[in-house]
């Protein structure tokens, strides 16, 4: 039989899980360099983007655990790529107590940047600091273009098409606005998001998502339908980006025994438009729920094997789910993270996010 | 209404009559049909009859229309049975799907092989793909250590 030519072997390898690909670097010198090449990592990313997955991290006793990595929560932020096990410690930054960090991606310059709140708004110091990942020396710098002053940030950020969005509360009469940070130009803009005002008391359940290309906010609350307690998903979609018009949609979820009796949160939206809900704490059995607004279907999926460690009742940990996780082999210069507990490092305590590029949301 | 038939000829001299609509799932064949050089049949010098039979079986199944109204879910189940083949046959199918430029078959065969090899040791992979190990034991150990995480 004719031997398989190298380019076809590459095609086969591009469909492997990242762990296998990294392991195959020991095949030979030729393959070690082929598997590290930009051509292959791009090919791998294309394949991986066609099968986005849910990535889970469980937090317990101050350690954040991805399937193979353990990180501890501390003051010093870290960016890590759970696919490759590489991490980068970010240089220390003086921040005020509730300062948030956001991760954004510039699709044109192909760069990741971290935007961090630093000081409360004042004339003496810049409110934000920016750090570009992938450069030789990581350092924080002040943004050149000022951000309009606001009282506090209210949500995690989401990066869509190279713009980082997050919800903030205005100074003076409290009202919601969306802060937009263009990752490439580092310019700030903002627009009204008064539709979220009635949640100013508690925005913890609200997340910003990319719903079919549009910025949206989702949260849930209990409702009532006759005798039955229902679960309602509320979604505000920025239908008109020019005029900044939001449209609100309310969905009453179909009855589901498991969902109706557990603690859950909204994890995000998949590229296919399914809203993903995830149980809050590890337990056995652990479920994730997919709600499709167009078809009004609710599907529960059992996730097995968080490991007996996390599943034991006394050990339950808070679960974070990342939707649209795509394996990415491109590696910033960084040290190898050892996966044993004895070598704990730190996770960015402000956003708990990992370096998975949000721009994958665009790939339909 | 009779559908247009074309003749495909394998490398070992066997002829197969196939509906044109089914055959043009192969981009290679589709181009030849466009260029109108199919009158005497299409010689496929790189595809043995044993493999061509499987390719034709695949294309017939994937030619979905009123006569063959199959669902995506059923196709996926069919794929699994179809790919229950010896590894060497699957490799030949990869080569054929590549040569004939049938994207979905190429994806299916490559993914099947990827799934078969993902748990294998580097030694087994070298043997499967005829890769010569040009690392010294020390060099190989160094690469392993560098990527320790992938071996746990």
Curated annotation (Swiss-Prot), chain B:
One biological process term in Gene Ontology: protein ubiquitination
PANTHER family hit by this protein: SKP1
Name of the featured protein: SKP1-like protein 12
Family assignment from sequence similarity: Belongs to the SKP1 family.
Lineage, highest ranks first: Eukaryota, Viridiplantae, Streptophyta, Embryophyta, Tracheophyta
Cellular component terms (Gene Ontology): nucleus; SCF ubiquitin ligase complex
Alphabetically ordered keywords of this record: Nucleus, Ubl conjugation pathway
Expression across tissues: Expressed in young seedlings, roots, leaves, floral stems, inflorescences, and siliques, with a slightly higher level in inflorescence than in other tissues.
The keyword Nucleus belongs to this UniProt entry's keyword annotation: yes
Quaternary data: Part of a SCF (SKP1-cullin-F-box) protein ligase complex. Interacts with ADO3/FKF1, COI1/FBL2, EBF1/FBL6, PP2B10, At3g61590 and At5g49610.
The encoding gene: ASK12
Any one Pfam family match given in the protein's UniProt record, by short name: Skp1
Pathway: Protein modification; protein ubiquitination
Main location: nucleus
The organism of origin for this protein: Arabidopsis thaliana
Keyword Nucleus part of the UniProt annotation: yes
SMART domains in alphabetical order: Skp1
Subcellular localization(s) per the UniProt record: Nucleus
SUPFAM superfamilies from the UniProt entry: POZ domain (SSF54695), Skp1 dimerisation domain-like (SSF81382)
Disulfide bonds: none
Its job: Involved in ubiquitination and subsequent proteasomal degradation of target proteins. Together with CUL1, RBX1 and a F-box protein, it forms a SCF E3 ubiquitin ligase complex. The functional specificity of this complex depends on the type of F-box protein. In the SCF complex, it serves as an adapter that links the F-box protein to CUL1. Plays a role during early flowers reproductive development.
